Amino acid sequence: MALQRNSKQNQQQWYRELVNKVIQLLQQNDHDSLALIARNCGVPPQLRHLVWPVLLKYHPFVISPSILSNTLIFDKTEDKWVYECENRARRDVEQAVMHDLQKFFVNKRSDQHMPLPDIEQHMRFLRDTIMRFLDKWERVFKYEVALAWIAIGLAEWVPIDGWGESAPGGGGVCSEDMALPKGRSTDVPVLQGKRHHITIRSLYKEYPLPRELSSRLTKRCFNFYDTFERLVLVILHCPDVTRTKMKVANGRNYPFISGGDVLFQTQLFFKIFQMTLPELYQPFTDEESLQSSRKADWIYWWFKACGAKVMHKQDRAHLWDVLLGWRPHPSTLNFYLDYNNKSFAHLYNTKLNLDPQFFHKVCKHGNDHFWFPDLDTLPLGSPGLETDCQVVNELIRHNSYESKDTGAPGTPSKTSQAGNNYRSPIRPSQKHQKDIPFSLIDPHVQLIFIYIAILQQNEFKLLEFEEAEITEFLTKVPLLSKTDDYSYKRLYDEESTSLSSTDTEDSQNSSSRPSTSSHMMIEVGNDDKIANTFDDLSQLAGDIWRKWMWFEFEESQDSV
């Protein structure tokens, strides 16, 4: 019990250190370090309303957008693209938006079926926000229900205009330089509660932040609409699939590094699922849960909406942290954004601006979660490395079985070590880190491996489930990061902050942040016995990525 308590205290000590550092980075406008933190260990929930706008301001998918269009439909019979614009009247679209929002807000158990006035104001504001987005992007994207749930998900962390950060009733619009007024620093009203039992409550009531810290907070760089628009551009991002296919000799591309459309993501998910969890894959595909029906709408929410509606708000926010914190090396931008004709690499700093001790708490092994041997050394996007196929061939050459230097066959390669040693080793080149470890694979592809990790974590439970229980799990995924949520809610409790001097000294001298489990594959699915963090899930996802890549290489070498 004493050991468990000490571990909990160390965990919360790390979270408090993280909150302090993020506030400092906000003051410095160090968006590169904020992005590194977001994608590797997540943004503290107390600070997402300030960090997310900064991350979105400098996000490559926002600066050079390309979203998945639902107004261009490919006609297979005519073998051409057909433009299908929104054919509903504006009022009908507004009613559709309100109908979808009411599914979240209205208490079905109530006799009145009418939300409270403040809830009603939030619903109207979110409707107007969505309509404003559609007015701007209507030629590319017409209304889908995902927009309503993305808006709701954002409102759970970011206050709508006219609430909290400026006086209510001020016309519903705030300037883009919104500050926390003195005396109201603890008033950041957001949506809280379970579905159909929603209240408007200060974010700091659920996730406390002491006044001495909240008084140091910076101005928010975007209002709610601007944050929403940019978030949608990231969630709905899609590479130019047609352009990519033209670069490949046979017209076929397998963009599991640079990213593909939702159809490709879904196909890749099931391929990895079959390889990683064959025992679970079989009953999944046998059940109607994965067929083209209403029961399969979880695929839409997992892949197109990036966890909106179906994930717990804390886990969904972690997924969005990964998306918003994604940053490739500036020199490789055009590999991931092959449609891009803008020059904005100068916006990103490649030099690490974190002290070594803190950096190795953020990146436990000095790498991005989704690193792979030699991938970070390749000049992606340069001649000869413009497509995923070319990159994979080069990686195979770098990680072959036979050592070209010694000529000794059967020498274990670095890839072999990555595939067989499931827990990531520390790479020697990263011991004295001077450069930021940038993202190496598309963020939506990263989510695929996180989803596989979720299924692996719950494999034993799912194997025992009936079809209806599997469907419920997929459409209402239970809270995964229990330790994160509990720790942040109790972060500044007296019991949490009253560490002994020995505990504090041990935590400060620790070179890595604590982990709740030695290995995620131990006690998989025992949700009631072990509390997990999203960091555990991300590390498992990275391990699955490297193991899957190893098997891909094995197949490629066998086919030669």
Swiss-Prot record:
Family designation: Belongs to the OCA5 family.
Residue ranges crossing the lipid bilayer per the database entry: none
Main subcellular location: cytoplasm
InterPro entries: Rab-GAP-TBC_dom, Rab-GAP_TBC_sf
Name of the protein in its database record: Oxidant-induced cell-cycle arrest protein 5
UniProt-annotated location(s): Cytoplasm
Organism: Eremothecium gossypii (strain ATCC 10895 / CBS 109.51 / FGSC 9923 / NRRL Y-1056)
Sorted UniProt keywords: Cytoplasm
